């Protein structure tokens, strides 16, 4: 039998910045076991007194943009400035495969051994909401352990960008120089949540020229989208592989934070906490449905009936909820 978690001792060790304790605490908040969930709530309650001034940045990008290379370059630049950097991931594929993304550390070999950086693969969970819950709570653990910059990478496709945008201060979108329409290939809605945009792989020569042209075209298009007086996402060029102009991207991230202002940042985080409250409710209901004896008793039969077309989805849903309510 697994011994109960000594939450108070774990809190002290996290605040003392012990890496093993940070890993243990994140494992605890990722767990779906009811006893672990209770311990995780106690842990997070005790850690809430930690300073909330860490810079939270979400990072996404088009396929093949070199996201991991860029994150490693940015993270290395930041630790060189004296920051402590935490890197987390939200990966919808872990919902389907049931496993975590183990490639994050292997793709960021230099940053993974940096004593002032902490990289955590995306957790496995039954739902994207579960992954988001674990990631948001892992972020709080890292901040309590003194990590003052948190980079959250979105992996794969789907709603992960919107999910991450709901837990960070600034959302950075990476794109590539393209022939023709620079907006082509950027998913609908992504520009609504992007605060800073960088055209990556702007290495020397033709690549840099193409990237600068793309950035200019994209910036022009954005000015037509955003109204006067609002924050218009700046479009920069950078090269994650060499680190070129990564510092300029970071400067724009800080400028966006200044644009929000202290009260604006507090209001944004408060709204995010309220949204996160309801996300936790939905995730907990998912967990309870999965554990429900009544639901388990009828699930297989309903599954067969729905697949066979003998029962429609709304009726099946009503039966599942009735079984859950009867527990």
Model-derived segments and spans:
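Well-ordered beta-strand positions
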Residues: 149, 170, 195-196, 234
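Canonical P-loop GTPase G-domain recognition
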Residues: 196, 202-259
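Flexible active-site lid/hinge loop adjacent to a nucleotide/diphosphate
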Residues: 179-209
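Short hinge/gating elements
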Residues: 7-11, 65, 122, 201-205, ...
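Long, well-ordered amphipathic alpha-helical subdomains in the mid-to-C-terminal portions
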Residues: 22-24, 237, 248-325
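Nucleotide-state-sensitive switch-loop elements of NTP-binding domains
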Residues: 5-65, 71-160, 167-174, 179-182
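Alpha-helical scaffold elements adjacent to nucleotide-binding pockets in ATP/GTP-utilizing enzyme cores
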Residues: 101, 138, 163, 167, ...
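Conserved phosphate/pyrophosphate-binding and hydrolysis machinery centered on Walker-type P-loop NTPases
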Residues: 15-16, 29, 33-37, 64, ...
